[in-house]
Amino acid sequence: LELSSAASDVYKRQPPNILLTTPESLALLMSYPEAPSIFSSLKRIIVDEIHAITESKRGDQLFLAISNIRKYCLDAKIIGLSATVNDPSLIAGWLAPTNDCDIILSDPGLVPEISILTTSEPPPWAGAGGLYSIPEIITEIETHKTTLIFHNTRAQAEIFFHNLWLANSKNLPIAIHHGSLDKEQRNHVETAMVRGELRAVVCTGSLDLGIDWGSVDLVIQIGAPRQVKRLIQRIGRANHRHNGASKALIVPANRLEVLECFMALDAIYENKLDSELQTQIPLDVICQHLLLVACAGPFMPLDIFNEIRTIEKYKNFNREDFDQCLDFCISGGYALKKYNQWHRLIQTSNGAVKLRDPRIANRLRMNAGTIQDSDTLKVRYKSKRGKSKGSTIGEVEEAFAVSLTPGDTFLIGGRIVKFESLRERVVEVSPLSLRHISA
């Protein structure tokens, strides 16, 4: 849910029948005074890919928000969905702390076909690119309808795609997809996939979840998987239909990863998955939650404390820690007491807590969230004469951008570009050659 201010106002007055949203956006909706009217008619809360949410602070933010809005819709049912849960009873505790939760284990379907790719050249002793396997991967692409080639990092994906393109003597339509690319380019690749126009896509975690392209019949994982669950999710992108067995190949990036890849295969066939839950209570998320609740209006601390303790993970959350979080929001805590700008909340004579200055509500909302992104800069083609600006390619980390000098080259979006200048937090580049690497 990313709406303009005007559209958001309309939404708050007329909530939709079905809302697809994120933990961050749900927390923002909770922070508005209109929250009671928005959620009073709520009947179902569905948390898809719940295993991915419960592994991080995003899960804490989501269930803190749910604990707050449930008072507006006491009869609402919560449903969690996942194909890779190690301990369903633990996840059920997040959904229904009172143990009133039905666990439905569906038939996992056909056993996936997974193997280590056999290559004529052995993997190197060091390195993490998997470039040695490109001849065999080209053959696999030629013999399958559509192949997804997963990498663990964006940099590895860029290097692999470039070398794959150079080896693509038959000019098969291939593309690259990752989170640092411009949204227009990602949409272009996704549209081409829907139309069945691509034979292969080199990608990262941007295509891990929620991708149901019927043409995909092979998944290749380059490098040892960091999680068994993540590998299963990626494998599930192939033959994603009720009666289809997923097919996947794993390519160790180097010889040290061979053992890890075989261990991952054993874990899959023995149905041994990674654990889901982080047991430590993130006090920073509690503080953020208190600030967002205050944006919606005054609250009684005991009420919010009791709401929080309805979450399974927080059932033993003690009042002392809660009060310290509240004190931090009111006075800045022991470290920031002398700085008035950190005195966000105030407690009234009747014990209620509210914003010290209602004008800071929007600022608090804008800074809400638990995703820690590194500072990035836009990468744009240098403007041509008569044009105000060139087209945007994607983003790079600021630390990388400031290390460049004019004339340096790098890969982004499958293109080799030459660094020209850094202006107004925009990296200006020019194409290195007339050859354009794209879908």
What is each model feature region?
Residues 1-7, 11, 434-439:
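Single conserved hydrophobic/aromatic residue that forms the stacking wall/gate
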Residues 227-275:
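Conserved segment of the helicase C-terminal RecA-like domain
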Residues 273-405, 409-412, 416-417, 421-422:
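C-terminal accessory/connector segments of nucleic-acid motor ATPases
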Residues 181-203:
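Conserved helicase ATPase core of P-loop NTP-dependent helicases/translocases
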Residues 77-94, 99-153, 254-255:
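Conserved interdomain linker/interface between the two RecA-like ATPase lobes of SF2 helicase motors
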Residues 24-27, 34-72:
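SF2 helicase catalytic motif II
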Residues 14-30, 195-209:
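Conserved two-lobed SF2 helicase motor
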Residues 209-223:
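A short beta-strand element within the Helicase C-terminal
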